[in-house]
Protein backbone atom coordinates (compact mmCIF):
# COMPACT_ATOMS: atom_id res chain seq x y z
CA UNK A 1 0.00 0.00 0.00
CA UNK A 2 2.78 2.42 0.94
CA UNK A 3 4.81 1.32 -2.10
CA UNK A 4 1.97 2.39 -4.38
CA UNK A 5 1.89 5.82 -2.73
CA UNK A 6 5.69 6.16 -3.08
CA UNK A 7 5.56 5.06 -6.73
CA UNK A 8 2.80 7.54 -7.49
CA UNK A 9 4.72 10.31 -5.69
CA UNK A 10 7.86 9.51 -7.69
CA UNK A 11 5.92 9.75 -10.97
CA UNK A 12 4.54 13.14 -9.94
CA UNK A 13 8.01 14.35 -8.88
CA UNK A 14 9.46 13.27 -12.24
CA UNK A 15 6.73 15.24 -13.99
CA UNK A 16 7.52 18.32 -11.88
CA UNK A 17 11.20 18.08 -12.81
CA UNK A 18 10.25 17.65 -16.49
CA UNK A 19 8.14 20.81 -16.31
CA UNK A 20 11.16 22.73 -14.96
CA UNK A 21 13.35 21.20 -17.69
CA UNK A 22 10.89 22.34 -20.40
CA UNK A 23 10.69 25.82 -18.85
CA UNK A 24 14.49 26.05 -18.93
CA UNK A 25 14.60 24.87 -22.55
CA UNK A 26 12.25 27.67 -23.56
CA UNK A 27 14.56 30.32 -22.07
CA UNK A 28 16.92 31.57 -24.72
CA UNK A 29 20.60 31.88 -23.99
CA UNK A 30 21.74 33.91 -26.99
CA UNK A 31 21.51 30.88 -29.29
CA UNK A 32 18.64 30.03 -31.58
CA UNK A 33 16.67 26.93 -30.59
CA UNK A 34 13.20 26.03 -31.89
CA UNK A 35 12.09 25.34 -28.30
CA UNK A 36 11.89 29.09 -27.58
CA UNK A 37 8.77 29.08 -29.78
CA UNK A 38 7.11 26.10 -28.05
CA UNK A 39 4.60 28.27 -26.19
CA UNK A 40 3.63 30.40 -29.21
CA UNK A 41 0.09 29.72 -30.40
CA UNK A 42 -1.30 31.14 -33.63
CA UNK A 43 -4.94 31.89 -34.39
CA UNK A 44 -5.36 29.59 -37.40
CA UNK A 45 -8.82 30.11 -38.91
CA UNK A 46 -10.05 31.07 -35.45
CA UNK A 47 -8.49 28.09 -33.66
CA UNK A 48 -5.49 28.58 -31.35
CA UNK A 49 -2.84 26.24 -32.80
CA UNK A 50 0.76 25.68 -31.64
CA UNK A 51 3.23 27.25 -34.08
CA UNK A 52 5.19 24.02 -34.49
CA UNK A 53 2.04 22.41 -35.97
CA UNK A 54 1.69 25.13 -38.61
CA UNK A 55 5.25 25.56 -39.77
CA UNK A 56 8.69 24.09 -40.13
CA UNK A 57 11.10 25.77 -37.70
CA UNK A 58 14.79 25.49 -38.55
CA UNK A 59 18.10 26.92 -37.32
CA UNK A 60 20.28 27.79 -40.35
CA UNK A 61 22.77 29.80 -38.24
CA UNK A 62 23.63 30.02 -34.54
CA UNK A 63 21.49 33.11 -33.96
CA UNK A 64 18.79 32.80 -36.65
CA UNK A 65 15.49 30.91 -36.60
CA UNK A 66 13.61 30.42 -39.86
CA UNK A 67 9.90 29.69 -39.75
CA UNK A 68 8.36 28.29 -42.96
CA UNK A 69 4.57 28.03 -42.62
CA UNK A 70 3.02 25.32 -44.78
CA UNK A 71 0.12 27.67 -45.51
CA UNK A 72 1.61 31.00 -46.65
CA UNK A 73 -1.64 32.87 -45.88
CA UNK A 74 -0.98 32.38 -42.15
CA UNK A 75 2.30 34.38 -42.16
CA UNK A 76 0.72 37.63 -40.83
CA UNK A 77 -0.97 35.67 -38.01
CA UNK A 78 2.32 33.96 -37.12
CA UNK A 79 4.07 37.34 -36.95
CA UNK A 80 1.32 38.72 -34.68
CA UNK A 81 1.53 35.68 -32.40
CA UNK A 82 5.32 36.02 -32.08
CA UNK A 83 5.04 39.72 -31.29
CA UNK A 84 2.36 39.03 -28.63
CA UNK A 85 4.36 36.22 -27.02
CA UNK A 86 7.04 36.77 -24.39
CA UNK A 87 9.83 35.69 -26.77
CA UNK A 88 11.05 39.29 -27.05
CA UNK A 89 12.12 39.07 -30.70
CA UNK A 90 10.70 41.01 -33.64
CA UNK A 91 10.03 38.80 -36.68
CA UNK A 92 10.91 39.84 -40.23
CA UNK A 93 9.10 38.31 -43.19
CA UNK A 94 9.80 38.20 -46.92
CA UNK A 95 6.40 36.75 -47.84
CA UNK A 96 7.40 33.08 -47.81
CA UNK A 97 9.44 32.68 -44.61
CA UNK A 98 9.75 34.47 -41.29
CA UNK A 99 13.19 35.09 -39.83
CA UNK A 100 13.91 35.65 -36.15
CA UNK A 101 17.34 37.06 -35.45
CA UNK A 102 18.29 36.36 -31.86
CA UNK A 103 20.14 39.38 -30.43
CA UNK A 104 23.23 38.98 -28.25
CA UNK A 105 22.32 38.96 -24.58
CA UNK A 106 23.32 42.02 -22.58
CA UNK A 107 24.71 41.56 -19.09
CA UNK A 108 21.49 43.07 -17.71
CA UNK A 109 19.34 40.58 -19.66
CA UNK A 110 21.57 37.69 -18.52
CA UNK A 111 21.07 38.69 -14.88
CA UNK A 112 17.33 38.97 -15.49
CA UNK A 113 17.26 35.48 -17.04
CA UNK A 114 19.15 34.02 -14.07
CA UNK A 115 16.48 35.47 -11.76
CA UNK A 116 13.77 33.88 -13.92
CA UNK A 117 15.62 30.55 -13.80
CA UNK A 118 15.88 30.68 -10.01
CA UNK A 119 12.17 31.52 -9.74
CA UNK A 120 11.16 28.62 -12.03
CA UNK A 121 13.48 26.28 -10.10
CA UNK A 122 11.96 27.34 -6.79
CA UNK A 123 8.48 26.66 -8.20
CA UNK A 124 9.70 23.18 -9.16
CA UNK A 125 11.19 22.56 -5.71
CA UNK A 126 7.94 23.69 -4.06
CA UNK A 127 5.96 21.34 -6.32
CA UNK A 128 8.22 18.41 -5.34
CA UNK A 129 7.89 19.28 -1.64
CA UNK A 130 4.10 19.59 -1.95
CA UNK A 131 4.01 16.09 -3.44
CA UNK A 132 6.06 14.88 -0.46
CA UNK A 133 3.68 16.56 1.98
CA UNK A 134 0.56 15.13 0.32
CA UNK A 135 2.06 11.64 0.19
CA UNK A 136 3.17 11.87 3.84
CA UNK A 137 -0.40 12.85 4.75
CA UNK A 138 -1.68 9.81 2.83
CA UNK A 139 0.83 7.54 4.61
CA UNK A 140 -0.29 8.91 8.00
CA UNK A 141 -3.92 8.31 7.06
CA UNK A 142 -3.08 4.72 6.06
CA UNK A 143 -1.26 4.31 9.37
CA UNK A 144 -4.45 5.25 11.21
CA UNK A 145 -6.29 2.71 9.05
CA UNK A 146 -3.98 -0.03 10.25
CA UNK A 147 -0.67 -0.30 8.40
CA UNK A 148 2.28 -1.01 10.73
CA UNK A 149 4.20 1.98 12.07
CA UNK A 150 7.57 0.67 10.84
CA UNK A 151 6.21 0.31 7.28
CA UNK A 152 4.90 3.90 7.44
CA UNK A 153 8.28 5.13 8.73
CA UNK A 154 10.12 3.24 5.96
CA UNK A 155 7.79 4.82 3.41
CA UNK A 156 8.39 8.30 4.80
CA UNK A 157 12.17 7.76 4.74
CA UNK A 158 12.04 6.55 1.13
CA UNK A 159 9.85 9.51 0.23
CA UNK A 160 12.37 11.92 1.78
CA UNK A 161 15.19 10.31 -0.25
CA UNK A 162 13.16 10.77 -3.44
CA UNK A 163 12.44 14.38 -2.53
CA UNK A 164 16.14 15.05 -1.93
CA UNK A 165 17.05 13.34 -5.22
CA UNK A 166 14.64 15.42 -7.32
CA UNK A 167 15.41 18.71 -5.55
CA UNK A 168 19.11 18.02 -6.18
CA UNK A 169 18.35 17.32 -9.86
CA UNK A 170 16.59 20.71 -10.13
CA UNK A 171 19.57 22.40 -8.41
CA UNK A 172 21.97 20.81 -10.92
CA UNK A 173 19.80 21.98 -13.82
CA UNK A 174 19.88 25.52 -12.37
CA UNK A 175 23.68 25.48 -12.16
CA UNK A 176 24.04 24.24 -15.74
CA UNK A 177 21.55 26.74 -17.18
CA UNK A 178 23.08 29.60 -15.17
CA UNK A 179 26.54 28.79 -16.57
CA UNK A 180 25.11 28.58 -20.09
CA UNK A 181 23.48 32.00 -19.78
CA UNK A 182 26.36 33.78 -18.07
CA UNK A 183 28.84 32.53 -20.67
CA UNK A 184 29.84 35.51 -22.82
UniProtKB/Swiss-Prot annotation:
For this protein, the record's SUPFAM superfamilies field holds: Ribosome recycling factor, RRF
What Gene Ontology terms describe where this protein resides (cellular component)? cytoplasm
Q: Which domain of life is it from?
A: Bacteria
GO molecular function list: ribosomal large subunit binding
**Record-linked Pfam families:** RRF
Report the subcellular localization: Cytoplasm
Mainly localized where? Answer: cytoplasm
Q: Which InterPro entries does this entry report, sorted A to Z? A: Ribosome_recyc_fac, Ribosome_recyc_fac_dom, RRF_sf
Q: Which GO terms describe its biological process?
A: translational termination
> According to the UniProt record, where is the region Disordered?
137-158
Alphabetized, the UniProt keywords read: Cytoplasm, Protein biosynthesis
Family, as annotated: Belongs to the RRF family.
Q: What does this protein do?
A: Responsible for the release of ribosomes from messenger RNA at the termination of protein biosynthesis. May increase the efficiency of translation by recycling ribosomes from one round of translation to another.
Q: Kindly provide the name given to this protein in its UniProt entry.
A: Ribosome-recycling factor
Q: Which gene encodes it?
A: frr
Amino acid sequence: MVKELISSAEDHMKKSVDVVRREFASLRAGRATPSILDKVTVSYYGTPTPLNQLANISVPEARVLVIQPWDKSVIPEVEKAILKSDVGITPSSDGTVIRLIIPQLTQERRTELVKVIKKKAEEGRVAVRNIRRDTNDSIKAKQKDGIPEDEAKRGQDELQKLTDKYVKEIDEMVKAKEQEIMQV
